[in-house]
Every structure is written in C-alpha cells, then in structure tokens.
Amino acid sequence: MKYNEGANLDPSQVGGGGGGGNGGKIAIGGGAGVVVLILALLLGINPGDVLGSGDQADPGTGQAPASPFAQCTRGSDIGKDRNCRFVAYTNSIQDYWGGTVQDYQVIKVQTFTGQISTACGTATSEVGPFYCSGDTAVYLDLGFFDELTTKLGAQGGDAAEAYVLAHEFGHHVQDLEGTLQRVQGGSGGTGPTSPGVRLELQADCYAGVWFNHATNDPQSPISEVTQADLDDALDAAAAVGDDRIQKKMQGQVNPETWTHGSAANRQKWLTTGFQSGDPASCDTFA
C-alpha cells in the first residue's frame, strides 16, 4: 500500500494509551491456552459475552488521556512515525462508510496494552481486535499484528492490518443496520451456516468493499492498493479461517464448532466485496 503524503489525517479517530489496569474480570492462562483464546475470539465482536464476563465495566478505567497519534495530521507523517498508518486506515474506512451509509456514526479505534475496560466487559490483549457495540468502538492491541504473523502464520503487511480494521468497522456497519442485534438476539449456535459465521463473513465482504473504494477519492490517505496488497489481505483472511486454526492448534477440523468461517469462505467473501464494490453484494444470510 502507498500513502498520499499530502492528505489530511484526523488523529481524533484513533486513541491510545489505554490498558494496564488491575481490575480485570477476564482470567486468561498462558502458553498454548492464550493462543487458543486468540484464535477462538479473533476478529470477534463482544469479548465479555464470549468469555463469560458480560458485566459492564467503567470504560475509563486504566485509560490515559494522552494519545500517541496526536501528531498524525498529514499523510507524510506516516514516513516519520509508522503508527500513523493506523490513522490512515481508520480515516479511509470511515470516509467511505460515511458517504455510503445513511446517518453513519464516526467512531473511534482505541488502542491499548495489556487489558482495557469497555462497555462489553474487561478485555485483554489475548482477545484480539474487537468491536464493542456497547460503546461503539473498535479495540486493538497493536501487538496483535505480531501474533498474526508469528502464531497464525500470516504474511502480514499493511494491507493485512487494514483488512483486520476494515472487518471490525464492518461490524459497526452491521450494528447501524440492525444486523448485529438480530443475530445476537437469535438462536445462536455454531457451524458453517450459523448466524454468527454469516455475520463474520459479511464483515469480511464489507472489508473487501472498502478496499475497492480505498483510492477513489484523490484526498484519500491511501493512494495505491496493488494486487500484492490484496494477496496479503486474502492471506490474512485465510490465516484466521476456522479450519486453518483448528488444524494448526488441534490437528483436526470440526466444522460444527466454527464461529468465523473457513479460510476459503473468508477469502471468497473478501473477494466478493472487492470485486463488486457494492455492500448489497454482501448478503451472506441469503
């Protein structure tokens, strides 16, 4: 991916300095158990519910007021501080959805270290990136991207990171559309055709739609997305497929326990979104 050095960035959309609190409600073991938890919850949407800690917590606990992204005001700042790329991803994704979804609500990406309290409960780094509908925010430990390559086997790269964030913003769009509420209020269950898997695949498709439009605006902070970038995004999508995860961690595949979809289906829906550029093509519930 290449960046538009002359583009304006809005650092207010990305916060940092959260985490490190001692009042966590989620206890997570170390070693392989941590990896399993990352894999099980990767790109999820409510860690409190999944981990059995649905009690609401004070979102302000452990968060520091200063943001490490405040200096990210121009595309050229990415060359000075690589962390500014997260502002570029976030701005571009929200610029697209803001012009596509009626009454779109701009939200914030909150980065943290260790653990953080949210309206969905207290989450730790091991949960992976997630969207919390309770406070309409995306939460991200930047160290997750090292886990994506070293433990999940993805190639990584900027486009892989952008895919992860675009997927989470896909959940925000689902929240605004009411899809998230319908799925969470339904019968639930797991498996390739379960509502939860369909929800995740739709978020993958929405990520692909954004990739299609990422460079359309001359003022976009992202100036180029190459085929190699798309390959990195597809590689990341496959790395978090349930079958790949189960094969790696358990040595066998059990489709009936899937929560996010197979590697092939995640790639399929990411590709569908990119090729169509149309959110209407992302009806994974049909």
Which ranges hold each PLM region?
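Post-HExxH zinc-binding segment in Zn-dependent metallohydrolases
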Residues: M1-G15, G191-Q219
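Long amphipathic alpha-helical segments used for membrane anchoring, targeting, substrate engagement
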Residues: M1-Q71
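Active-site recognition of the HExxH zinc-binding catalytic motif
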Residues: I38, W97, L140, Y163-L176, ...
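Catalytic zinc-binding patch centered on the HExxH motif and its immediate surroundings
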Residues: L51, Q115-D141
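Short helix/loop segments within enzyme catalytic domains
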Residues: C84-T90, Q94-Q102, Q202-I245
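Short pre-active-site segment immediately N-terminal to the catalytic Zn-binding motif
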Residues: D146-Y163, G191-V197
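Catalytic Zn2+-binding segment of zinc metalloproteases
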Residues: F169-Q184, T215
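Pan-zinc metallopeptidase signature
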Residues: G241-A286
